[in-house]
A protein has these predicted regions:
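N-terminal subdomain of nucleotide-sugar transferases
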Residues: 2-48
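Conserved nucleotide-sugar phosphate-binding/catalytic loop shared by glycosyltransferases and other
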Residues: 38-84, 88
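Short, well-ordered coil/turn elements that cap or connect secondary structure elements
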Residues: 9, 37-39, 63-64, 119, ...
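Conserved beta-strand scaffold positions in the cores of enzyme catalytic domains, especially
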Residues: 65-68, 124, 176-179
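A nucleotide-sugar donor-handling region in carbohydrate enzymes
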Residues: 47, 51-52, 152-193
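Active-site and donor-binding regions of nucleotide-sugar-utilizing enzymes
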Residues: 13-18, 24-30, 57, 71-174
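Intrinsically disordered, low-complexity regions
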Residues: 10-11, 60, 186, 190
Length: 193
């Protein structure tokens, strides 16, 4: 995949999917950078896994999601979060037809989005890839989500050489593993950090 354009010559349609405040905080600078770059057409899809704090991050960065799945329901189980996210992201992929899907971290929303993209044969880019504790149950379910996401990822963007090395020890193709730190600092006065 190149960053020049799609096969039709237009900008790359990159779907960024998140559902929690930490994901939003980490992906918001990427969303705004892509919106300022004519090579990209970012599509923001929010699952709403953690509804209450997403809006303040969106307001801070001036982001209006293209699609809000609004899956949050009091007392929902991990199975319900996964099911609602998988179905909702699947519908969003069919509607927007992205060239790639970006997920961040280890949430259930990230796992479901990666799986939906894989099912639609859309490349997955995983930001903050390769983090491992060595115990699939700790933290739960995040460690399992990390490992599952890595199985369907086309490009692993690792925050450290240690996380890169974790993926290489798991026999991940070195050609799809990059050490990549987000190239932007925390904005001054950012109260949402």
């Amino acid at each position: 995949m190149t960053t020049d354009s799609t096969p039709t010559g237009g900008p790359l349609r990159v779907m960024l999917v998140y559902g929690t405040r930490p994901e939003a905080i980490k992906l918001a600078p990427l969303v705004t950078a892509m919106r300022d770059d004519e090579r990209f057409n970012p599509i923001v899809v929010v699952t709403g896994q953690h509804r209450e704090m997403l809006d303040q991050v969106h307001d801070f960065f001036g982001i209006v999601p293209d699609d809000d799945l609004d899956i949050h329901s009091p007392g929902q189980t991990l199975t319900q979060i996964t099911n609602r996210s998988l179905q909702g992201v699947g519908r969003a992929i069919e509607a927007y037809r992205p060239d790639a899907v970006v997920v961040q971290g280890d949430t259930t929303s990230a796992f479901a989005a990666a799986l939906a993209a894989f099912y639609h044969e859309i490349p997955v880019l995983h930001v903050e890839a390769g983090l491992r504790t060595g115990d699939i149950s700790s933290p739960f379910p995040e460690e399992a989500n990390r490992r599952l996401i890595s199985q369907v990822t086309a490009l692993h963007l690792c925050p450290t050489t240690s996380s890169r090395d974790n993926l290489l020890r798991e026999s991940t193709d070195p050609q799809i593993v990059r050490t990549w730190r987000q190239p932007w600092p925390t904005p001054p006065g950012a109260s949402c950090w």
